[in-house]
Amino acid sequence: TNPPFSLFREYIKQLVDYDKKFLIIGNMNAITYKEVFPLLRDNKVWLGNNYKVNAGAMFFEIPEKIANLEQVREVKTNESGKKVYITRVQGIRWFTNLDHGRRHEPLQLMTEKEVIKFTTKKPFEKYDNYDAIEVSLVKNIPSDYKGVMGVPVSFLDSYNPDQFEILGSNRGVDQDPNKIYGKGSYLNGKEVYKRLFIKHRKK
């Protein structure tokens, strides 16, 4: 069974501490929890293989007696003739330590020059307080950039540990790769949203 998200930190720690194989559901925000992020960074835990389906949402059957009709996405009839209420939950993922093929699919990317020419129309900017460039969309990660890049947490949906190394995040000193700054990374004086810091693995 899957515990409530409020117990996610304790539950995943227990599974890892006892060296269990697992496949559990958690909120996308759990990625930057101080108890969870090191597991993702060190490739002890990763996302499951159906994360790209339905734009990161999952569908669940809910009992009729507790169904909130405003949240019901679809009503079906099963083989027994009973109504089945389907609800859609956004922003959740499978977290697992079971390997799967999609985890090793290389992300197809353009070079830095190609990204600037065809997409951004301007050079990548560096953070005010990190020696890294801001890449706001995963598809714009330059294939030939050798330094550190700040990317959205949704990068983990496409993360290939053979292609990239996760260095840290901007959610706290314990996750900052340089152990200097606290929460937040800034671009032209404005704080950007949650970011992971990554770089290409040397070939």
Predicted regions mapped to residue ranges:
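Class I S-adenosyl-L-methionine-dependent methyltransferase catalytic core
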Residues: 4-203
